[in-house]
Amino acid sequence: MIKKFFLVDKFYLTAFAILIPTSINLSITQFVTPLLNAIMGRTDNPAISISSYSIAISVLFLIALPNLRIQHLTIVYYKNINKLKVHFFVILISTICLFCSVLIIYTPASNIFLEKIFFTEGDLRNNVEKCLKLGFYIPFLLIIKMHLYAVAIVSSKSSLIWAGTIFGFICTFLLAIIFYLIGFEGFRLGISAVAYSLALETLAIFMLVRNDLLDFKLKFTRDIFMVGDLFKFFTPLLFAAFIPSFTMPAINAVLTRLDNPEVSISAVNIGIGIFGAVSFAIYGCQSTILSLMSNGYHYFKIRYFSYFVSFLTLFLCSFIAWINPVNHFIFNTIFNLDEDLYKNTLLVFRLLSFLPPFLVMEQLYVGIIMNSKSTNPIIYINICRFLVLIIFLGASIFLLQNGALVGGLAWSLTLFFEAIFAWLFGKNIKKPD
């Protein structure tokens, strides 16, 4: 049966060939951040440097939020309409984000972000401002890069995804080492390595996919600039990207009101991070599902493949969560968590460990909704998810005192119900043949 699954039906080999590099590409930040932190930790004033870089990059990634969804739009539309129209829309969105970046960083609006939202002052504020000015163009490049990777995904050219991702990672590492040896300040080292490597990676993936970017049989018409249909498709996706970004701040706000908030907040953040690293394959499921649909593969094959990946991930998460020598090695030996933090982090991880099939279920049905090109249900799904989060957090203040339990349940319940709502809204939509 295993032989038949992998060798006879080449669909599964094709699917894995797209999934693995796409998942690594989308989760590469989880590998780059510790690397940069380790190098910045060897510079003068490492705490301020790492904090300055972290705040600055979080602001830039918030401005670049459309990059999380531009890949999905590209995959859905690239083979169905004039490619030039998709390219124009991506350039338009990236230019708008660049304008927002300049407006926020180079005008008095920066004071609102740095002083009122992030409460920075003194050297920390000055360093964050310098970081932002060094990397103001990062949102523009991020959106362009994700669009180019989407072209490689929808063209089923996994080798190009591997090449671009590995090249970008190596560039980041080498540039960070070079800037360290030159004597850059820590925060300048971090933001410069990310910005320059991003520019090089974007150029590299552009060169790799250049033959798939244009179709010379297509005519340059006025319709290329009429992108109202793409905005209509994209707006719900952007809304869906904003809602999850409020989940962690909302949970942290509640945890500060419960017992032992420092340990609880740390446990929830570490638990989520470890779960994300263990379940990294799921990061690429959405793009893989959309690519397979776009290339005409049968829905039932896509569904079987997606759930196969989810149950493999479920097995791995359960193995770590419930086999004591394994979780002790990871949480205590590798992450050096003390007894109290270890127990609370393990509790969070166990509460999340059952989620992989539901995470894939949500991505599958949202993929069906996207493939239909009518994305309004995605707004309703995320509103329902947000209501579940608010209701649970409101009740937990009065009913529960264990912060790790509240944080873990908040994440697991909202993601579980998001999958249920996705199924409810997507089950009656026509599946791709």
Question: Residue ranges of each PLM-predicted region?
Answer:
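Alpha-helical transmembrane segments of multi-pass membrane proteins
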Residues: 122-148, 278, 339-365
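Membrane-interface helix-loop junctions in multi-pass transport and translocation proteins
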Residues: 169-202, 386-420, 424, 428
